[in-house]
Amino acid sequence: MKNSVQLITYVDRLSGGGFPELRALLDGRLQGLFGGVHALPFFNPIDGADAGFDPTDHTIVDPRLGSWDDVRALAGSVEIMADLIVNHVSAQSSWFQDFIAKGSDSEFADMFMTFGKAFPRGASEQDLLNIYRPRLGCRFQRPRLQIGSQRMLWTTFTPQQIDIDVHSAHGALYLETILDRFAEANVTAIRLDAAGYAIKKAGTSCFMIDETYAFLAKLAEKARDRGMEVLVEIHSYYRDQIEIASKVDRVYDFALPPLILHSLFTGDATALARWLEISPHNAITVLDTHDGIGVIDVGAHSDGRPGLLEPQAIDHLVEEIHRRSEGQSRLATGAAASNLDLYQVNCTYYDALGRNDDDYLIARAIQFFAPGIPQVYYVGLLGGINDMELLGKTGVGRDINRHFYEDREIDLALESPLVKRLSDLIRFRNTHPAFNGSFEVATDDTGSLVLSWNLNTEFAQLVVSFSQGKATITASGCYDFTFSGAIA
């Protein structure tokens, strides 16, 4: 994976079309900004129950976006990351519909995770309470088969997303078939979506248990055999992230976004500096994604071990996002929106900072200086604001940060002072040789955060005074960049 900034985007929501249009945009108005693209699910269909994360067929490109030839053509310009949705398939998939029609006589009957597979002797109330689930509601569904019987099936996320038994013959073959298709299209990295929920075992939380680590290691090996790196997507306790990072190619730094907000809101960089001292260097760093802003990643463990932030600090963080977004994030979070996520605040990162340009650039500068490969979400690239109209149409909280851009909007955004300055930061991160060297984090006598990269005679340094709302970048090659935001 190139050590350069990557773009995260839905193919159609940024380009207004398919893969050919996205390629034209990257080769045109966005030329030189991104070394790679995480193309969010482009499988058939892209407009299912979960915005592409519930494909009926993971091996088919939605024809509205193009074909695998178009994916391969884009791979000739930039590295491509694609999602391998590990945990589930659509209830509308041909495999599940065959199971509905034929029951145990279906050749795909073993592909789906039933209650009985995990609990062959039944489950106590405590067994069920132990199961970790990120959303409200029942984790099981009881569809009626056409032959008249019912089966209790795992549905970790929604009733439309049926969990796979990844150890079954058809489940394993399904995942390997997707890997083969990715490799044929020259995909260079895969993101294992919802991987932490893949293994179910009685007496456990059924989330990131020992057997999950073993499964991920084997799946990652299969991907590497096909020439692809592996990124694991898991929202979890920060120590778990460090452990996961030692076993895979890449892991998300999901603690970074809330810690930066906390520092900007309070003027205190202590927690952020402590995290940057121990955070995995093989990380993918983000501020925003297609999901909300996570808080579980900085919280305490369920067994009581302390997190990166105290509970009251997390409460303040969430309330401050709601305040700075003028209540819009509250309308998109928790009980106010469907697809409930218990650990995320739905809001654009720009709105979470009260649309303060300098605070936003300070946050991006910290991200670009943090260890790892930075990814920038398409809405964040354009300084996007909360899409209240889309939220109102769908009632899905995360749609507040999933805007459909028109060409004119993109042109206007690219001409804005904010996006021009952000583009300068991206180009600096992509081209300065110091970012291929060694990283150091410190705090100076004034409490400012100091992030440094050094490679032989090349250097780049970011100094952020959160108490003054000011940041300065100095680097070899006469680079100098100063910006001041709102004082907390």
UniProtKB/Swiss-Prot annotation:
It is an enzyme of class 2 (transferase). Its EC number is 2.4.1.7. The active site is at D193 (nucleophile), E233 (proton donor). SMART domains: Aamy (SM00642). One of its GO terms (biological process) is carbohydrate metabolic process. Keywords: Glycosyltransferase, Plasmid, Transferase. Coiled coil: none annotated. It holds the Pfam family Alpha-amylase. Gene3D superfamilies: Glycosidases, Oligo-1,6-glucosidase, Domain 2. It catalyses: sucrose + phosphate = D-fructose + alpha-D-glucose 1-phosphate. The keyword Membrane does not apply. Belongs to the glycosyl hydrolase 13 family. Sucrose phosphorylase subfamily. This is Sucrose phosphorylase. It comes from Agrobacterium vitis. The lineage of its organism: Bacteria, Pseudomonadati, Pseudomonadota, Alphaproteobacteria, Hyphomicrobiales.
